């Protein structure tokens, strides 16, 4: 089976747009769990543009599945994670001016920093994942820093300008998923996946979990959050049938 991690960031984006206390990302997370989500993913960004510390603290107590906290590799965020102790943490690159995470974490360039963060988080009992581009050198670096999980960045696949380019990106993801799996890593994937492009990624047998958020929140505007989650989960399961 393949697992679905529902990212609730953009429920919080809508809330923050007007500075209200609704819509509640807490409620969205609980509805997602009831509707088939296997994990709840949320990104506490340094600029706090959507998810807030209070959201993380409340959800850590209320979730029945797993919390997958996305975080930059900074002292502030690593210390916060060690205090809250999510089930999983996915370390991601972060720039304040970006609309969304634009690429994978450069584990090679930031090797010492990532290695130290992995050690601290692991000692705190948190499973560490690294959000990386589908490249063998980055996967090898993830192994060397001691991360047991990687999340392959699917943005280049999703944003490819032509069907030929998209197919080439898919083949890269497929081969790198197999490579990482053969090296003993759990392989997750995510970024810019939606209802029209998820099936080929979900079909890759080495991939354990997909993290999807924006597309589900957008679909929920028309059919409701619970049904949007159920549709995505069904789509993923059918890819493996």
From Swiss-Prot:
InterPro entries: Aldolase_TIM, PyrdxlP_synth_PdxJ, Pyridoxine-5'_phos_synth
Source domain of life: Bacteria
Entries under HAMAP family matching the protein: PdxJ
Signal sequence extent: none
Entry annotated with the keyword Zinc: no
Any GO MF annotation of the entry: pyridoxine 5'-phosphate synthase activity
Subunit-structure text: Homooctamer; tetramer of dimers.
CDD domains in the cross-refs: PNPsynthase
Short name of any one Pfam family annotated for the protein: PdxJ
Biological process, per Gene Ontology: pyridoxine biosynthetic process
Record-annotated site: Transition state stabilizer: 151
Keyword Transferase on entry: yes
Pathway info: Cofactor biosynthesis; pyridoxine 5'-phosphate biosynthesis; pyridoxine 5'-phosphate from D-erythrose 4-phosphate: step 5/5
Catalytic activity as recorded in UniProt: 3-amino-2-oxopropyl phosphate + 1-deoxy-D-xylulose 5-phosphate = pyridoxine 5'-phosphate + phosphate + 2 H2O + H(+)
A GO-annotated cellular component: cytosol
Residues where 3-amino-2-oxopropyl phosphate binds: 7, 18, 192, 213-214
Residues annotated as binding 1-deoxy-D-xylulose 5-phosphate: 9-10, 45, 50, 100
Enzyme class, spelled out: transferase
Location(s), subcellular: Cytoplasm
Active-site feature positions: 43, 70, 191
Protein name, entry field: Pyridoxine 5'-phosphate synthase
Function: Catalyzes the complicated ring closure reaction between the two acyclic compounds 1-deoxy-D-xylulose-5-phosphate (DXP) and 3-amino-2-oxopropyl phosphate (1-amino-acetone-3-phosphate or AAP) to form pyridoxine 5'-phosphate (PNP) and inorganic phosphate.
Family: Belongs to the PNP synthase family.
Disulfide-linked positions: none
EC number: 2.6.99.2
């Amino acid at each position: 089976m393949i697992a679905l991690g529902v990212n609730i960031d953009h429920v919080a984006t809508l809330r923050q747009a007007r500075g209200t206390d609704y819509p509640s990302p807490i409620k969205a997370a609980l509805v997602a769990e009831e509707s088939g989500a296997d994990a709840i993913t949320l990104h506490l960004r340094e600029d706090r543009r959507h998810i807030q510390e209070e959201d993380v603290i409340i959800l850590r107590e209320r979730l029945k599945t797993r919390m997958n906290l996305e975080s930059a590799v900074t002292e502030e965020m690593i210390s916060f994670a060690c205090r809250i102790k999510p089930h999983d943490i996915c370390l991601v690159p972060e720039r304040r001016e970006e609309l969304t995470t634009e690429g994978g974490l450069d584990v090679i360039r930031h090797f010492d920093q990532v290695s130290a963060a992995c050690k601290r988080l692991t000692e705190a009992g948190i499973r560490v994942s690294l959000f990386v581009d589908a490249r063998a050198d980055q996967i090898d670096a993830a192994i060397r820093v001691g991360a047991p999980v990687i999340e392959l960045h699917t943005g280049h696949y999703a944003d490819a300008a032509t069907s030929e380019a998209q197919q080439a990106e898919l083949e890269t993801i497929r081969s790198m998923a197999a490579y990482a799996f053969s090296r003993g890593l759990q392989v997750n994937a995510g970024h810019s996946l939606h209802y029209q492009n998820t099936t080929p990624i979900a079909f890759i047998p080495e991939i354990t979990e997909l993290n999807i958020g924006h597309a589900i929140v957008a679909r929920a505007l028309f059919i409701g959050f619970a049904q949007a989650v159920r549709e995505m989960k069904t789509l993923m399961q059918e890819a493996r049938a």
